Amino acid sequence: KTIGMLLAAGIVGLSTAVLSAVSVGGRVPSPRTAGSVNAGLDLMPDIVSGLNLLAGEKYETLPSANGIGVWNGEEVVPMDTEDYIIHVTAAEMPATYEKEALKAQAVAARTFAMKHLTGELRCKSGHTICTDYACCQAFLTTEQLRERWGSSFENYYARIEAAVHETEGLVLTSGGELVTALYHSSSGGRTENCEAVFAVALPYLVSVESGGEEDSPEFTSEKCYTTAEFISKVNSAFPDAQMSDPAKDVDVWQRTESGRIQLIRLGGTVVTGQQLRNALKLRSTNVKFSITQSNVKITCFGFGHGVGMSQCGANAMAKNGSSFDEILQHYYTGVDIERFEVDSGELCLLPEQTNE
């Protein structure tokens, strides 16, 4: 999947609203009150244009901070922010996942939405946020969910609604600032450093182990080609490759800490792992080749860019008894879980945090 949005690594300071930020400190402040359309938000454009820092742009006030305007491709639909998070969570994570995993997903999705509301993340449509998973976050309407879930609709919707309500207003911060809460379907066993994918280092997006994913259908996938098919696809995507013999013309030059291909020689050209993934429509850049005289088999580990929270890993942690805050603090290193409070229709980060 590709993304046309611009990611921001810095937080915008807003000065005119009230955020009651309560650090978790080992526990979460009490809240006030199955099948996804895609395999996790995969924020992966290409290695060059994936991350754009919006340094210096300030958005001081936010009208209608209790809600969010969602562009559906035809019009902007005003929604309550928490209702929006329900529909995003339903689209981004299977409803059959463990409740604590669904809660972790809701917090990540809410953080991502708040980054859009503050103007730190930009939608390529020019609107605040859209329903295109390749740009912002996946989104399914109630009617689409009924069609997808059939007779399980009431049960599945209630599960996701509860996960969102039980984490109402909670977001992820680092140093008092909203984080860029990237997530993906499956890491293949270990997540990736942000700089290895997006060329920007973020202290909370670092490589961590992600155990328990082996039983997920997203953990591995295979693509098999005849030698002629593989040569044709490679030479079509990369004319300078001029490949003739895959056994001699495929050479992995560099892998990341988690095993993902960073650079690979294909005949007479060298490309990035992401360029290879795009060209062959692979699920990830963590791949291994098995080449014979007649065939080329590519085994992929994981699904997605591998940065941030692995949804399959989150579900595995939840099955093993981890709470949603433990899941989030595992995948987003050193973050705090805080609550947004809106006053006078405006939103900001309160400079001072209070511990509870």
Language-model regions, residue ranges each:
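Sec-exported extracytoplasmic/periplasmic mature domains
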Residues: A90-P94, V107-G119, G169, N235-P239, ...
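N-terminal Sec-pathway targeting helices
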Residues: K1-I11
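C-terminal soluble interaction/assembly domains
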Residues: T272-E356
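Extended substrate/cofactor- or partner-recognition/assembly subdomains adjacent to catalytic sites
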Residues: T111-V296, F301-G302
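N-terminal, intrinsically disordered, polar/charged segments of Gram-positive cell-envelope systems
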Residues: V24-W71
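Hydrophobic alpha-helical membrane-insertion segments, chiefly the h-region
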Residues: I11-S23
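Soluble non-cytosolic domains of exported or imported proteins
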Residues: E75-M79, T96-V107, C224-A228, G304-G308, ...
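Acidic/histidine-rich, surface-exposed loop or edge segments in extracytoplasmic proteins
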Residues: G67, M79-E98, V206-E218
